[in-house]
């Protein structure tokens, strides 16, 4: 389930993250309750992206956060 940022307080969550090729522009940052949902969001975003920024696989990942909003681990999507 997709979460708003204010809903993430006190629970672990996964953030779907995509940066452009340069690493200067974040194209996606959405929070989900499961890793699979977050990975699916990244894949769907890339599949449907119509913008002008270049997306590379190493800048597409899912970041896991704990209940205190500390990053635990990053997971590759591609």
Question: What are the residue ranges of the model-derived segments?
Answer:
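Secondary-structure transition/turn motif
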Residues: 17-21, 32, 66, 75-78
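A short, exposed loop/beta-hairpin motif centered on an aromatic-Gly-Thr core
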Residues: 24-40
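Extended rod-forming repeat segments used as scaffolds/tethers
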Residues: 11, 37, 73-75
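Short, mixed-charge low-complexity intrinsically disordered segments
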Residues: 47-78
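Short aromatic-glycine-(Arg/Gly/Cys) micro-motifs in beta-strand/loop hairpins
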Residues: 1-26, 55
